[in-house]
Structure formats: C-alpha cells, structure tokens
UniProtKB/Swiss-Prot annotation:
Species this protein is from: Schizosaccharomyces pombe (strain 972 / ATCC 24843)
Keywords for the protein's UniProt record, in alphabetical order: Chromosome, DNA damage, DNA repair, Nucleus, Phosphoprotein, Telomere
Segments for region (Disordered): 381-428, 546-613
Gene this protein is translated from: nbs1
Domain BRCT, chain residue ranges per copy: 107-186, 228-302
Name this polypeptide is given: DNA repair and telomere maintenance protein nbs1
Domain comment as written in the entry: The FHA and BRCT domains specifically recognize and bind phosphorylated proteins.
Length: 613
C-alpha cells in the first residue's frame, strides 16, 4: 500500500495511507476519502490528481507497488515527480519511492510503498477475502513467494497445523488469522488521516503462538536442528522441500511411488511422507527404515531434544531389524516331473477323484454308491435321481443321507447273495461292479481309491451291486434312464467283473491262446479252480484286437484321444432307478455272442476289463 508524508506541516504532521482510488490534491479541499488537503498558499486550489490502481497477480510474486499515476490540473507552475515535470496527460510510476513537488511549495511530499502480500492456506478463505484486500492495495495468493509478508492460518475447530504454516513459521513470516483481516477492514476510514493507526500484525502473531501448543518457542530453535541427518521424500510439494532444508536435512527425492530407489533409501536415516500420499499398502520400504509423516516430524521438532529422539528411534528400528530378520523364502519354479500313471491309478495309497475336472469335495458321511455309479456329466443335463451332495450341507441332511446309504448297503448285500447262488446253479453270466468301500471311515481323503474284489473273498465292508429278479420288465422309461445313467468317460477307472459258469470253465483251455500271454492269467485260473468261476480282465489294447465290442465314436468326445470309452454295462442288461442291474436269460445268450469271431467259433468267457479315462 502507498503511504504519503511530508516535511513541515503541509499535511498536518501526519502520514496517510492511499488505498486504490482517485484523490484530488489542493489547498482548498477537505481531507476525506477522495481529497488530500495541503496547507500552502503557493499551490492551486485544485492542483493535481493522484490515482492508485489495484494490485495485479504479478504484484503478489514480485512484491512491487501498484501503479501510481500523477496528473497536473493545468496549473501555472506545474507538478514535478522525482524532479521531472509531469506531462499534460499525466504519467504513471512503478517506483517504490516518489518525491512529488507541487508548484512553488517549499516542501515536497514523499510517497513510498509498504509491501504487504498475504498468503492463504485455505482456498475458501482466499475467495472470501481476496476482493476486500485488493481494494486495500494488498495482493493475495495461495502459493508461497519471496514477497509474502503475512500468512493467514486456518484456525477452524479440529484443524491441525499444515505444512504451509510450518514453513511460514520457520522463515519468520507473520502469521495472522481472519480476526486480523476483519479488524483491518473496519479501520479503513480511520487510517486515511493517520497511518499509525494501522493495526499491528505482530501483536496478532504473538497471541497465536502463545495460545497454540503446536508451535515451538521460536523459529531459531528449529532452524538447522536436524543438521547431519539425511532423509528421502516424495517430490510433491515445494513447501515441504523448503521446510526440510530449513531443518538442516540432506534430502534425496523420488518423483513418484513407482520411482522409489530402495538402494538410495537404504542409505538415508529416515523417509518423510506427505499425508496426501501416505498409504502403507501402496508403499513398501526396506526393513529398518524409519518412515514418518511431516506432521509426525513436526511434533518431534517441537521438543527441545528432537535430535536425541530421532537418533533413538533410528537405532531402535535398526536393532529390531537385525534381531528379528529372517531370510525371505525364495519361491522355486515348479518343475514338471513325469509320474507313473499306472501306479497313480492302481495304488491304494493315492485315491482317485470322481472326475479330473471336478472341484467337489465330498466327505465320507455324504458319500454313497450312487455318487460313484452316476458321476456328474460334463455336458448336458444330469440324470434324474442323481445325488449331488455338496460339502456345505447341513447336519440334518448329512444324517438323512447316512441313513439312506445304510439301508441301501443292507439291501445290496442281501440281494447280492441271492444272485450269486442262483447264477452259479443255472450257468448264467454275471456282471458285477467293483466295490468302492475299501477306504476306512477314518480316512480324511474326500475320494476313495478303487479296488478289485475277487469273487469268493469275504470282506467286512464290501459293497456289491445286486442283481434284481428276472421278473422285472423293462419299460421305455427304464431304458431311457439306463441310457442316461451309464458312466461317461470323465477320467475314472471302471472295472467290470465277468464270471462264467462251471460248465463253461471246461472250455477255458480253448480260449487260452488269446489270454495265455497275460501275466495274471495263471493266477486267476488257479483262484477260479479253487474258489469261484474263472475271471478274466481284458485290457483296452486286447479289446481292440479281438473286436469284442463295437466301437462307437460318437460318445468319445471330449474324451482325451489317448484313451477310449466302452459301455459300462453289456447289452441286454436292465436297471431300475435305484441303481440295480439285472441280466436275463436272453441277455446271457446275447452276451456269449460277443465272443471273438474265429474259425473255431470259440466262446469268450472272459469278456473284458475296460479302462475308462
């Protein structure tokens, strides 16, 4: 703002503040907001006109004065500024000191610029006070500049000290609040005649420091208080950088979170972060690095022993890191190891899942025979009656399924004994499924391993699908259900037991030329002569050679090309919806017709053991 004063008594011995506006200077005018009276008979009644322009945005950063325009009002002796005559149209001046001589007046008027640039910490407060302060000739802004003389602190309830306030305190800027601005606007009329009535901002600053415990006692106690320490910081604010420089720190900056140089940070004593970017989940620093925000650092600075506090914290973190450090586990890449597929399939130690892509986890309590007979289909709808037991069923459902499975087991055991007795007497060919109950109930595995049961052996937990009575008539619904019930090739192994009558055992020597090369042929032949009718297990390769079953390629997809799929139940077998299969007399005759076609027309009593994948 511009202030004028003069030697002698031409201005009544007072200094006056010139706010932006127009003033008429003469000996016959009154002193008010638009006139300046000069007591001298050597000047005209209306001698000159002074005009003060409002400050510009550039003036806030330069601290330069507002334009001072002087125009002579056609006087006899004219007007001089800095010993130069003012032109007829007037002249404007940007100097900070002006010496104005009016006509033949023996005294000069001295005009000088008092710089006052106010910085705001809050944009809302800036928009509220900017226009009023500009009318007083005071430039305002948000950014720090070398010309800033006053800093308006935000004193809202619950607000903490900001980085701008810290920096303003350390560089000895006068800190004020909105109460000072209100008082400044009310004394405008009174300070026109006497500039000494201008409110003192230092008194306001002292009151703020005295009543606020977030400030140190003086800026001198904080400047260079951390000299000798080094820190790293994110280069987001110039005020933060200047603040740390005033504290005496050696600063290493990184431009962004992705540009963090851990080797550079490991050489520093601590890391300083702004609150705006502080996020422990996004920023990861090496162990033993002391990280803190600027607000936390300022709280340490307030204490008189700030150097000792920081040194102790750094030593504590380094000691904790050295004592608790454990080598990080290096994750080795998994190498592909070839496994013996046969051992994985037939080993009792490694249970097989129901299907290769199945993610269902079944407990032993929810496990039933139907789960193995009818696995979930990969494509199409599930067959009716299929039990899909999930692992998250309630205890009531588990109990109910357990009771049903017990009833099914008892019925299967009784029917199995009857079918075995009738089959051996009448010479029927019987098909049985492999028992899946070889896993103990205490086993924690959700899948049961597959196991072969030799006919004639008695096991405590054996489960065999029984053959229903021959009087059951096959209906169209049963045939449709049977077609949907048959196993699809989802990667599990299926065993079908082929038993022949004692009469057909006599002809086994004629068919030995097809199976004598098998390793287990003599073993099964020996067991069959002692305990039960002869059994044979035909592999997939032998099945292709003998052409026992017709290949149906329509049902092979999406089965892997290295495997093949055959029907789980021979033609002629019927089943009801409870999962029980039966073979009539007609089916036994048709089953014998499936023997290999040779010149001797020999029967194939051994049928096949089919491997499904």
């Amino acid at each position: 703002m511009w202030i004028i004063e003069a030697e002698g008594d031409i201005l009544k011995g007072k200094s006056r503040i010139l706010f932006p506006g127009t003033y008429i200077v003469g000996r016959n005018v009154s002193d008010d907001s638009s006139h300046i009276q000069v007591i001298s008979k050597s000047i005209s009644k209306r001698h000159a006109r002074f005009t003060i322009l409002t400050p510009s945005e550039k003036d806030y950063f330069t601290g330069g004065p507002c334009e001072f325009e002087v125009k002579d009002l056609d006087t006899k002796f004219g007007t001089k500024v800095n010993e130069k005559v003012v032109g007829q149209n007037g002249d404007s001046y940007k100097e900070k000191d002006l010496k104005i001589q009016l006509g033949k007046c023996p005294f000069t008027i001295n005009a000088y610029w008092r710089s006052m640039c106010i910085q705001f910490d809050n944009p809302e407060m800036l928009s509220q006070w900017a226009s009023n302060l500009n009318l007083l000739g005071i430039p305002t802004g948000l950014r720090d500049s070398d010309a800033t003389t006053h800093f308006v602190m935000n004193r809202q309830a619950g607000s903490s000290i900001t980085v701008g306030t810290m920096y303003a305190f350390l560089k000895k800027t006068v800190i004020i609040d909105d109460s000072y601005l209100q008082y400044l606007s009310t004394v405008k009329e009174s300070v026109i005649e006497d500039a000494s009535l201008m409110p003192d901002a230092l008194e306001c600053f002292k009151n703020i420091i005295k009543n606020n415990d977030q400030f140190p006692s003086s800026p001198e106690d904080c400047i260079n208080s951390l000299e000798g320490f080094s820190c790293a910081m994110l280069n987001t604010s110039s005020e933060s950088h200047h603040l740390l420089e005033l504290l005496g720190l050696r600063i290493s900056t990184f431009m962004s979170l992705g540009d963090i140089d851990k080797e550079l940070i490991s050489k520093t004593d601590f890391v300083v972060l702004n609150n705006a970017v502080y996020d422990s989940e996004k920023i990861s620093f090496p162990e033993g690095i002391f990280c803190l925000t600027i607000e936390q650092l300022w709280k340490i600075i307030i204490e008189r022993n700030s150097r000792e506090l920081i040194s102790k914290e750094i030593e504590r973190l380094k000691y904790a890191t050295a004592s608790n450090s454990t080598p990080q586990k290096i994750i080795q890449p998994q190498r592909h190891i070839q496994k013996n597929i046969v051992d994985d399939l037939f080993s009792v130690k490694k249970p097989l899942p129901c299907s290769p892509k199945s993610k269902r986890v079944k407990t032993l309590e929810n496990l039933s025979i139907m789960d193995f007979v009818q696995p979930k289909q990969m494509f199409g709808k599930e067959p009716e009656g299929y039990l899909s037991n999930q692992s998250n069923n309630g205890s009531a459902q588990n109990k109910k399924s357990g009771d049903n499975s017990e009833k099914t087991k008892n019925s299967l055991k009784s029917s199995s004994k009857k079918s075995a007795n009738t089959g051996s007497g009448q010479g029927k060919t019987k098909v049985e499924y492999v028992s899946y109950n070889s896993v103990d109930k205490g086993n924690s595995s959700p899948f049961k391993p597959l196991e072969l049961n030799v006919v004639g052996e008695k096991k405590a937990n054996a489960e065999v699908d029984s053959l229903p009575s021959e009087n059951v008539q096959e209906s169209e619904d049963d045939k449709a259900f049977e077609e949907n019930r048959r196993l699809r090739n989802l990667g599990s192994v299926e065993y079908i037991r082929i038993m022949s009558s004692e009469k057909s055992n006599a002809n086994s020597r004629h068919t030995s030329k097809y199976y004598s090369g098998r390793k287990n042929f003599k073993k099964f032949q020996k067991k069959a002569s002692q305990k039960a009718p002869l059994q044979a297990f035909l592999s997939l390769s032998e099945h292709k050679k003998t052409e026992v079953f017709d290949q149906d390629d329509t049902d092979l997809e999406p089965v892997p090309r290295l495997m093949s799929k055959v029907e789980s139940i021979p033609a002629g077998a019927s089943s009801d919806k409870s999962g029980k299969s039966s073979i009539s007399k007609k089916s036994s005759n048709s089953f014998k017709e499936l023997s290999p076609k040779t010149n001797n027309d020999e029967d194939d009593e051994f049928n096949d053991l089919k491997f499904h994948f």
